[in-house]
């Protein structure tokens, strides 16, 4: 199964400045676990670089992700261009 999601990261703006980027990574992972019904989510390095490109405090408001679920139920997510 392959899907493209636009994941909102507004909830990460409501945490202290110094933990916004790590919180955004958790939000992306939890979003994909919920919507793809998977227990294991592997995030590509490109997603991590996009969330951290402006530092820990200034995260993007949303991120576009391509998620692919294999037969084992593992979701691999990459940044959609």
Swiss-Prot record:
<dbReference type="InterPro" id="IPR023621">
    <property type="entry name" value="Ribosomal_eL31_dom_sf"/>
</dbReference>
<keyword id="KW-0687">Ribonucleoprotein</keyword>
<dbReference type="Pfam" id="PF01198">
    <property type="entry name" value="Ribosomal_L31e"/>
</dbReference>
<dbReference type="InterPro" id="IPR020052">
    <property type="entry name" value="Ribosomal_eL31_CS"/>
</dbReference>
<keyword id="KW-0689">Ribosomal protein</keyword>
<protein>
    <recommendedName>
        <fullName>Large ribosomal subunit protein eL31</fullName>
    </recommendedName>
</protein>
<dbReference type="GO" id="GO:0022625">
    <property type="term" value="C:cytosolic large ribosomal subunit"/>
</dbReference>
<dbReference type="InterPro" id="IPR000054">
    <property type="entry name" value="Ribosomal_eL31"/>
</dbReference>
<comment type="similarity">
    <text>Belongs to the eukaryotic ribosomal protein eL31 family.</text>
</comment>
<dbReference type="GO" id="GO:0002181">
    <property type="term" value="P:cytoplasmic translation"/>
</dbReference>
<dbReference type="GO" id="GO:0003735">
    <property type="term" value="F:structural constituent of ribosome"/>
</dbReference>
């Amino acid at each position: 199964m392959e899907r493209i999601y636009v994941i909102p990261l507004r909830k990460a703006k409501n945490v202290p400045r110094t933990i916004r980027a790590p919180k955004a990574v958790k939000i992306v992972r939890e979003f994909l676990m919920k919507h793809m019904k998977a227990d294991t989510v592997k995030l590509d390095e490109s997603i991590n670089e996009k969330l951290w490109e402006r530092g820990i405090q200034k995260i993007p408001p949303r991120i576009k992700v391509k998620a692919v679920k294999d037969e084992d139920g593992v979701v691999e997510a990459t940044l959609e261009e």
